[in-house]
Regions:
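N-terminal beta1-alpha1 ligand-phosphate binding loop
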Residues: 1-31
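A general structural signal for well-ordered alpha-helical segments in protein cores
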Residues: 3, 16-20, 42, 58, ...
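Short hydrophobic segments within beta-strands
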Residues: 6-8, 36, 107
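Short, glycine/serine-rich, charged loops/turns that create anion-binding
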Residues: 10-11, 40, 97, 111
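Short beta-strand elements in bilobed, periplasmic/extracellular small-molecule ligand-binding domains
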Residues: 31-40, 44, 132-140
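N-terminal beta-loop-helix "entrance" segment that forms/cooperates
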Residues: 38-55, 145-148
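Helix-loop-strand module that forms the ligand-binding subsite of alpha/beta enzymes
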Residues: 53-131
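Glycine-rich phosphate/pyrophosphate-binding loop and the adjoining helix
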Residues: 131-174
């Protein structure tokens, strides 16, 4: 299974990027995970720009999504919602064919638990006709990271392993 992992934060030391990076150690054998790092390079969405030729960063994101079997998105919560940069990326994908029907594991990690952002993301992804596997919203603080940014909380690793197993099942033929 090939997965594009999208951290919803632009922060250099993002806990959500750390969560997705840890997925490689708990995902089913044979899983290839690519961490998307272009969120900050996407132009602000405008329907006027969503015509051929579309902006290169948008074309690259759509191509990356088209080349994988599934997505994994992890988002923090800012002011009771998903970050604007993540919503911007999703807005660029609304008119694209690549995400339709694609399985997506959604997890949200934030010191507050990210419940509001998680609910927003569920609504948006379902509206986009994506096959959402709800990995849940988790209370996640920097205290659960080691010095190299690895996750030290066994309960988070277990939840991530379960989510990726469900994602693999959703990608299985038949």
């Amino acid at each position: 299974m090939r997965v594009l992992a999208i951290p919803g934060s632009l922060r250099a030391t993002s806990s959500n990027a750390a969560l997705l990076s840890a997925a490689g150690s708990v995902a089913p054998a044979g899983t290839e995970i690519t961490l998307y790092d272009g969120l900050g390079g996407l132009p602000h969405f405008s329907p006027d720009l969503d015509v051929e030729p579309i902006p290169a960063p948008v074309a690259a994101l759509r191509a990356q999504i088209g080349a994988v079997d599934a997505l994994a998105i992890s988002s923090p919560e800012y002011a009771h919602g998903m970050p604007g940069s993540l919503k911007n990326a999703l807005d660029w994908l609304v008119s694209a064919l690549e995400p339709i029907g694609k399985p997506v594991l959604l997890v949200s990690a934030s010191p507050s638990g990210a419940r509001h952002a998680h609910a927003q993301l569920l609504e948006v992804l379902r509206t986009m006709s994506m096959q959402v596997i709800d990995g849940g919203a988790h209370v996640f603080s920097r205290a659960k990271l080691d010095a190299s940014g690895g996750i030290t909380a066994p309960e988070l690793l277990a939840a991530l392993a379960t989510g990726f197993a469900q994602l693999a099942e959703a990608c299985a033929p038949g």
